[in-house]
């Protein structure tokens, strides 16, 4: 009979206990109570954080937006068709991040930074938080460098500086996107990284924009972020933050960046949809109470950094669509108050054939004048005033039959200045070209040229300067100001070209 030794048994048990090593996985899990319309209500998830990423059973990712006493409200970043009532949801412990880096340049990505251009994966290991804090007061510096748009009317009267936020506002089909695209095209050779964010647009429209940028060689320094109209509202709401995050990476590397949000009205509508589905109380125009913060925290990320942080900049050109020119609606007034000025596009001017259809009277740049090139400042100082006076006189002259010679001269000058500022799409001008034509218009050199021929004259003058007076573009390009020598060359060129033009 085998004798049982208690000490041997106890040592075996002790060994077994010591060698027992089971990995315990603790996860924050919840259950779907209700799902539909791109939102889900989840029971559990006691430790969920605001804006935390949640993973559903079918692989769909959501974001925790409402943290309530007994449930969590989440928005889905997918269709959610595979999610059922009672299915499990896991908290990931991560806040939304997007990939960033040089590899994104010349690519088209969705609101989560995933490539959608069919050119394979994006090779980058770096990510940034989707919602990063904006640079503080000490980190910033005054706007001091120009961001040339290549559009004479803007660069002369409503100049934009690097690090500025300039709103482009107007009715549908007034050329808002055209101004933004021209600005991107004009950054060629300027070492500026551009990010174009398309929010809630037709996929065909985005494809057209990409074609234009590719044709002009602008995709080499541009990232396109697209959340089209058939994407979930969550992605349309997140897309602008993705664009800002991608640009922020380059800004902190000391580069100049330009971000275009086309357009923030659709982002606000997507956010309104999400908020109403999450049963948040509606406010004015049914928008939630924090819709101002939605845009202010986005646009505050645009800045000109100080030299200690590398002197990089992020210039924001948000676009807002108005209804029948109503700039006093909720979202337009919000964004006007956040930005550093606005470029107002008028459908009346557009239909009358004045393109870009910029209404100089109510367009303003609050900080750009500090960044305007000296040459343009010297030349275009009186331009806005002249055009404003002309607009007033034009309205008055419709009722007056006999006008004195001075008024007639001012009306004639105004008509020609308006013609000078007309510009075809996708053909931005260099600073010296803008300086030359504005100088000719303001100093009366075009007064005896019929308005219908002003465009032909200015085009010819630019070609004449380029070929016969190459020193003029060189001086203005290098010195950034209109020196006496440059001015005499310009006067000479205008005189010589005019003789041949009128002969």
UniProtKB/Swiss-Prot annotation:
One of its GO terms (cellular component) is proton-transporting ATP synthase complex. The record marks 363 as: Required for activity. It is an enzyme of class 7 (translocase). Transmembrane segments: none annotated. It is found in: Cellular thylakoid membrane. It catalyses: ATP + H2O + 4 H(+)(in) = ADP + phosphate + 5 H(+)(out). HAMAP family: ATP_synth_alpha_bact. Belongs to the ATPase alpha/beta chains family. F-type ATPases have 2 components, CF(1) - the catalytic core - and CF(0) - the membrane proton channel. CF(1) has five subunits: alpha(3), beta(3), gamma(1), delta(1), epsilon(1). CF(0) has four main subunits: a, b, b' and c. This is ATP synthase subunit alpha. The gene is atpA.
């Amino acid at each position: 009979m085998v004798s049982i030794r208690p000490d041997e048994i106890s040592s075996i048990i002790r060994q077994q206990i010591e060698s027992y090593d089971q990995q315990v996985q603790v996860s924050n899990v919840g259950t779907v109570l209700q799902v539909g319309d791109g939102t889900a209500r989840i029971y559990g998830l006691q430790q969920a954080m605001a804006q935390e990423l949640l993973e559903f059973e079918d692989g769909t990712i959501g974001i925790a937006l409402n943290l309530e006493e007994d449930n969590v409200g989440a928005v889905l970043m997918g269709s959610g068709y595979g999610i059922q009532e009672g299915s499990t949801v896991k908290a990931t412990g991560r806040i939304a991040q997007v990939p960033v880096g040089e590899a994104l340049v010349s690519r088209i990505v969705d609101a989560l930074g995933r490539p959608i251009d069919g050119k394979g994966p994006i090779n980058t290991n770096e990510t940034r938080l989707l919602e990063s804090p904006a640079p503080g007061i000490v980190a910033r510096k005054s706007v001091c460098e120009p961001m040339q748009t290549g559009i004479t009317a803007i660069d002369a009267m409503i100049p934009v500086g690097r690090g500025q936020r300039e709103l482009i506002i107007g009715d549908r089909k007034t050329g808002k996107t055209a101004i933004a695209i021209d600005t991107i095209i004009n950054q060629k050779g300027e070492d500026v990284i551009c990010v174009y964010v398309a929010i809630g647009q037709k996929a065909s429209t985005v494809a057209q924009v990409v074609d234009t940028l590719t044709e002009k060689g602008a995709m080499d320094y541009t990232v396109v972020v697209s959340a089209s109209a058939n994407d979930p509202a969550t992605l349309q709401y997140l897309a602008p933050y993705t664009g800002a995050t991608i640009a922020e990476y380059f800004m902190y590397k000391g580069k100049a960046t330009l971000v275009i949000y086309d357009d923030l009205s659709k982002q606000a509508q997507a956010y309104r949809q999400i908020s109403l589905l999450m049963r948040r109380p509606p406010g004015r125009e049914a928008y939630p109470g924090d819709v101002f913060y939605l845009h202010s925290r986005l646009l505050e990320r645009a800045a000109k950094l100080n030299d200690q942080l590398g002197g990089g900049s992020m210039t924001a050109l948000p676009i807002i669509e108005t209804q029948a020119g109503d700039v006093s609606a909720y979202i337009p007034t919000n964004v006007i108050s956040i930005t550093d000025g606005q470029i107002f596009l008028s459908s009346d001017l557009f239909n009358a054939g004045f393109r870009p259809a910029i209404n100089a009277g109510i367009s303003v740049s609050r900080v750009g004048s500090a960044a305007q090139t000296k040459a343009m400042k010297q030349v275009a100082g009186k331009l806005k005033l002249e055009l404003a006076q002309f607009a007033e006189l034009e309205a008055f002259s419709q009722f007056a039959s006999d006008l004195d010679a001075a008024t007639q001269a001012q009306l004639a000058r105004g008509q020609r200045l308006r013609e000078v500022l007309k510009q075809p799409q996708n053909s931005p001008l260099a600073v010296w070209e803008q300086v030359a034509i504005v100088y000719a218009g303001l100093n009366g050199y075009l007064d005896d040229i019929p308005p219908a021929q002003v465009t032909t004259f200015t085009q010819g003058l630019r070609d004449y300067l380029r070929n016969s007076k190459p020193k003029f573009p060189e001086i203005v390009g290098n010195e950034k100001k209109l020196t006496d020598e440059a001015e005499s060359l310009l006067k000479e060129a205008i005189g010589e070209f005019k003789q041949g033009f009128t002969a």
